[in-house]
Curated annotation (Swiss-Prot):
The lineage of its organism: Bacteria, Pseudomonadati, Pseudomonadota, Alphaproteobacteria, Rickettsiales. InterPro entries: 6-blade_b-propeller_TolB-like, PD40, Tol-Pal_TolB, TolB_N. It is found in: Periplasm. The gene is tolB. GO terms for biological process: cell division; protein import. Residues 1-18 form the signal peptide. This is Tol-Pal system protein TolB. One of its GO terms (cellular component) is periplasmic space.
Amino acid sequence: MKNIIYCILLLFSFNSYALETINIEHGKADPTPIAVNNFEADSASDNTVGHEIVKVISNDLKLCGLFHPISSASFIEEKTGIGYKPLFAAWRQINASLLVNGAVKKLENGKLKISFILWDTLLEKQLGGEVLELPENLWRRAAHKIADKIYEKITGDTGYFDSKIIYVAESGPDLKKVKRIALMDYDGANNRYITDGKSLVLTPRFSGSADKIFYVSYATKRRTLVYEKDLKTGKESIVGDFAGISFAPRFAPDGRKAVMSIAKNGSTHIYEIDLATKRLHKLTDGFGINTSPSYSPDGRRIVFNSDRNGVPQLYIMNSDGSNVQRISFGGGSYMAPSWSPRGDYIAFTKIIRGSEGKTFNIGVMKPYPQDDENSERVIASGYLVESPCWSPNGRVIMFAKGWPSNGKSSGKNRIYAIDLTGHNEREIKTPGDASDPEWSNLLN
């Protein structure tokens, strides 16, 4: 974002640190105790913003499950700010391995100047720091960016806190649901509605830059429109009127093409559309249902599900439709694959039918399981779990989770997130029912 100016503090190096890097891919790690100290402020209003920034940073670090923010009620040292050396013994006494000190100041141009330093209290060393200048109303993004820097320093991976979620917001009784496209921060804050609820909408999808989305709108019983909407300008245009489309297209990584499934003459096939010319190119052949395509991060391959062999399974093909390979071989029906932005895993929904009914599962697998016999792994299960999507760093999966109605209450749908390891499942708060989540890349 052009109105954010980054000024890296040169005397704070991110190149060396003493704490052992947290491995976020293997098993459940014990959370690292961290103290996020009150940010120093020059005025009462700056102090209020500083307190809110500390709350957001602490919440980000807590939600990811890798850090344990220590309550400020336990703090011994009362000094705040970045212009002094902390009393490390006081922080070690409350078991804080890491310390974040910061300051916030309103500049003459109306912007906020927000600074922070990350300390290793065990070796009494600075791990890094940064200064951000940005409009006052973007203080929350500054907090997310600081949390991202801390996450990156300690895990060695990029963070995911400064990102957005697009989803379908649902309201009203079960048989008369009003569905609107909604946008929110990754943690559920700043929720706003993108559509008015006058028509049924489904499967919103981000562009690679998170500035644009696709979504499907059932304008009438006979018309299924795909819209492209610019989230910055609000401008909306019709990509096409595609009878038989079931999911919104997914953008290619380069943003010039998209891929989708369309039902015609008893079969459903994968098509690629050139967004400039609106020209369609059919990628799959034969009889059956081929749907839910998702590009690999480099745009060279596409994963999709197909029932060409009787039961829906996962397949990979080149982006031109050649070299089709089946990659799932387990029992059950595989659906809604989503390729990790790192390229190392594919998430999917798996439905297993048994004597007591259907069980829904969210799983992950390697793109080429023949190289790893134990590549498939279920990480979440429930009455209804579906629509998996990935965090920008490919280490967290978000999905929709549903419960049935009963005599006392109607059914409900919510959005949940879970780590790639299968640990730390948590609800992402929304104003009401929610489905079809999609996670953006990190914001600019």
